[in-house]
Amino acid sequence: METSTTTTLLQQERIPENSEPISTHIHTHSLPPTPPGTAKPSRIGSFHDLQELSSVESPRLDHIKPYPLPPKFSPKSVLKEDLKTPDNFVERDPRLIRLTGVHPFNVEAPLSDLYDEGFLTSENLHYVRNHGHVPRCEDDDILDWEFEISGLVENPIKMNVRDLINDYQQLTYPVTFVCAGNRRKEQNIVRKTKGFSWGPAGLSTALWTGVAIGDLLSAAKPKRGARYVCFEGADKLPNGYYGTSIKLNWCMDPNRGVMVAHKMNGNPLPPDHGKPVRIVIPGQIGGRSIKWLKKITITQEPSDNWYHIYDNRVLPTMISPEESANLPEVWKDEKYAIYDLSTNSAICYPAHEEKVPFTDAPASYKVRGYAYSGGGRRITRVEVTLDKGKSWRLANIRYPEDDYRNAPEGDTLYGGRVDMWWRETSFCWCFWDLDIPLDELKSADDIMMRAMDESMNVQPRDMYWSVLGMMNNPWFRIVIHKEDHALRFEHPTHATLKIKGWMERVKEAGGDLTNGYWGEKAPGEVQEVVVKEPEKQICMTNPQINRKITIEELKAHSGEEEPWFVVKGEVYDGTPYLSGHPGGAASIFGAAGQDATEEFMAIHSENAKAMLPTYHIGTLDEESRAILSGDATKTNDDADREVFLQAKTWSKAILDKKTSISPDTKIFSFKLNHEAQKIGLPTGQHLMMRLRDPATREAIIRSYTPYSDGSDCGRLDILIKIYYDTPQRKGGVMTQALDALPIGHWVDFKGPTGKFVYHGNGLCTINEKERRVRRFIMVCGGSGITPIRQVLRAVIDNPKDTTPCLVFNGNRSVNDILCMEELEELEAANPSRCRVVNALSNPPPEWNGLKGFVNQALVPEYMDLPKASGEGDELLLVCGPPPMVKAVEASFLGMGFKSDDFVFF
């Protein structure tokens, strides 16, 4: 049977359910933990349909392995940001930081999350570099996906993935991928390059399974004179299909480890990583490892593909972005092409904005991070300085990659031979650490580090700026701030747009980041007044255009027909550039009818800004600018009005009281303008709150569902869980700002907002469309109880409303269950209309309720009561942490519910 054969091939050594292989190698260094294995495959992963079709049980990996195995991966889903893009079928992890807007998908993980996963990176957090949309390959077509080997060969080959798996020896080994733009944001702060900003997490490590490319090329028999191997993928872009090349002798050298891969961490390749087949080139920049492979061509010369010539190059530093546009021969010069990675490293802990208290802290702090090199060269030393390079100390280095060299003879993993014992080459990153006494950190201004590889190639002190901003690898520096009772650490940059590091701070203060002293004054240097020169302004308008455009005209072009967008108050027509945009038309559609200033200015290069005059059609009038920006500075001064909330203007209320209901949750009470003033919030909707960040004074805006009933008068109560800063991660900006707000301070409110309104007696509207409900199934966790409670009370408080409500409240511990007594009272008084099921993932021994997560395994036995009655649909109302929401959605979809049966708050 074809289906059985297909799934058998794809499922060879797939990570099985209920299997947790463990590592026997005990590490004494402070290496971030690599979880020993994956308990079970994602049920909403790219291959879940094939899993269910398979009748062949996967081989188990419950024997002991002497090396790290992949971390457990979390369920993913198609994110709302991608729904209007060509990638609307690709499941992704919301933790990944988008670096180029919504589309195309270019992301890195938060640095601490990446480091904490350990040596191997899960599919969830692996960085992604996509030049355009993801080519779509259906699961049923994977084994039939064809690629060819042609050119200067005696035996041209056309083969498919089935042939690749059946006819050639399979290998498995770890490889660290690094984007050539890793740490580019540091260069962009010094001067904007033509590349978008990467933080220091543009790298990841995975186990790859496939065939040595030398085996395939040997079968094709390259002819005399052949010197290069060109690769081309299926991703069609404005300048053709993405392609590149490397040298033939590298491909034929087993030490180089070049592979044609079809598995990642034991599972078939996910869409973002080349599904169904890709090239893996250890030790070289990620841009050479073509995804969605279609062609391998043997040639006498390097690739003439547009992307091989105009990408992944380090041009001489004196060439500016403007000059580079008119130097085609320089771009074609192969000596500027990047292949092997350079020595590079970063400090992961202390994390950005991490604080270490002076009291109740250990006597020393373990500084930790990563390092890597290219071309198979091993990192041989990592050095740390606390005095700007006057003296250095050696760090400890741990090489988890070496554990794979200890694999027993004949060992296989995920269907491939663990082919490492004989290799002298190093394909992966390593981890380093160094204990530094806290007293020494107190007396230092910064921590800097550098790495060296076995060729004695050491990271330079100073940056080598280039037009593409690639291969940035100067010493990694974090600044130490002495505060009242703690040390605060500041990284050079942060991957997100709004979080700044010391480089931005120094530059904004007028410092020269190229002065050889990190923009600061050298000891003994005479203080002089620095006049900060204004940055060179790129003209982004056409001086011959003087048309005034209204908000009505702009909104008429907010769709895919003639999309207009706004940058700095100027209006541009993106229609002529739909086919030429590097990210595809979806990038322009996503900005249609909107003010794209912040995103455009932060992401785009000087060249892109210089192109804007071509598309300039007019200026937004002043009134329209105010409307488009949300009229941010205006508030409603009509204090005597009947209803407090206003949809288009902000209204002020004064903080009157804070009431703690758990260690990290409070009810914030606000006094309205007069005792008879109604809140004005329909059931099921929420409001927006605005206040200023106490440090930056920038506006913080978040949405909340009040604890108060929407018809209450004179007061507004909001239940909020406060996410405090920890040594591992930064807490919630808004919640901590609210917690620090003194009684008597004003806060701005606007609303109502939301797509769902409950009108009573089983009638609701979703996006203004009426819907009859015969039973509510409500699922929440933590402070997600607030919108659920609001709808539940609206039902129960109306004696004529007979709509049954089944509530699943999932939390970690008893202390996390908010409004517990109130919900129990509602259930006891209304058994025919209300049932509350509490579930704890970390219950105490005396807990008698549901144990575990709210999912398909635990929910069905509670679904019968209270029974659904009357006409209409069962509607799921869901609010909680993102991982919980995704798991709940997957579980109920698996139980037969449809996507339009969900309302997510």
UniProtKB/Swiss-Prot annotation:
Annotated region described as Disordered, given as residue ranges: 1-42
Binding annotation for NADP(+): L875, L876, L877, V878, C879, G880, P881, P882, P883, M884
Binding annotation for Mo-molybdopterin: C179
InterPro entries: Cbr1-like_FAD-bd_dom, Cyt_B5-like_heme/steroid-bd, Cyt_B5-like_heme/steroid_sf, Cyt_B5_heme-BS, FAD-bd_FR_type, Flavoprot_Pyr_Nucl_cyt_Rdtase, FNR_nucleotide-bd, Ig_E-set
GO biological process: one example: sulfur compound metabolic process
Residues in Cytochrome b5 heme-binding domain copies: 546-621
Residues bound to FAD: R702, S703, Y704, T705, L719, I720, K721, I722, Y723, V733, M734, T735, S783, T786
Record's function text: Nitrate reductase is a key enzyme involved in the first step of nitrate assimilation in plants, fungi and bacteria.
Descriptive protein name: Nitrate reductase [NADPH]
Organism of origin: Fusarium oxysporum (Fusarium vascular wilt)
High-level lineage: Eukaryota, Fungi, Dikarya, Ascomycota, Pezizomycotina
